[in-house]
Amino acid sequence: PIANSINQLNLINKLNMKKKFNRGIAVHFDTGMSRLGLDESETNQFLINKIKYNSIKIDLVMSHLACGDQAKHSMNTKQLDKFRIIRKHFPNSKASLANSAGIFINKKYHFDLVRPGIALYGGSPFLNSKINFHHVVNLKAKVIQIRKIKKNDTVGYGATFKAKKNMYIGTIAVGYADGFNRKFSNNM
């Protein structure tokens, strides 16, 4: 599990003291993304009172780059500096800062392990990438029916599409029954 707040660390600490939880965890520190992790106040509170949490085995300390897709963005250096300070408090724990974009910025962001997200699936974390990423999967489906509909006819679950004019529509052989989320209806 990954602890993202003091409340979660307190809960894990209580469970450990009652011998109900006894595995290593990761602690996520927010160094600038303002999304997940202990914020600056919680980080300071945790580090000052670290001895209180000595029942917790911390296998990994981590953070997430907010601007990794912009290699020269000053935020990357700010986050790296903050993360290095935090990491010094956990010399026996592995550390991770680099997300997909961070992998390609510079090795100094790698620490002990990297966390490829979109890159794992062949997606580029960069808007204008010179790196030749290859998607690992493609969705292909055959058109199994073509039909003519009239203006104001509706189509699909929830009648989410309404024809603005007489038109032809095609139905492909993939959908809800195949695990394809309905939110993609009329959005392909």
Predicted regions and their residues:
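Functionally critical, mid-to-C-terminal surface segments that flank or help form catalytic/ligand
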Residues: 140-187
